[in-house]
């Protein structure tokens, strides 16, 4: 949805330097489409809390290697929240995992797993890997991630998931190069 909003903004604005749809209007539209859409407009590493309305940019270390694994199952944010049984601002102490100053706990994980058990399977495989620093699920799912200190620890699991899951691995700087940088596009190009 975020990519469509950006494309529509480009088409609407055309070559005009004066009649641009404002970024604030983009965010108003994004909020109406779904609680996760404004975060997708950012296209940055973010910590999102509450119902998607509290967004904070975070800096992920480039000293680590990241593995993204998606089981090719689409979960809508609305669907995951509808299966969300309890909302608590307190993270159980035994569930806290930190990477620097960033907590990796995701309160939507149980809900997403109830809809897509493959997420549990992926995380179980990741947790068993030697030298994994942390793993979890991104947002409302279904993409899972693993964080490693060394690239050589990713390659065996990459081969395991390669045939049946969409995957990516590398450092943060590599990911930034390979994905659409929506926020840069918003700031500079349109």
Where are these regions (language model features)?
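Short, small-residue alpha-helix embedded
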Residues: 1-14, 138-148
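ATP-dependent small-molecule kinase catalytic core of the GHMP/sugar-kinase superfamily
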Residues: 10-134, 147-190
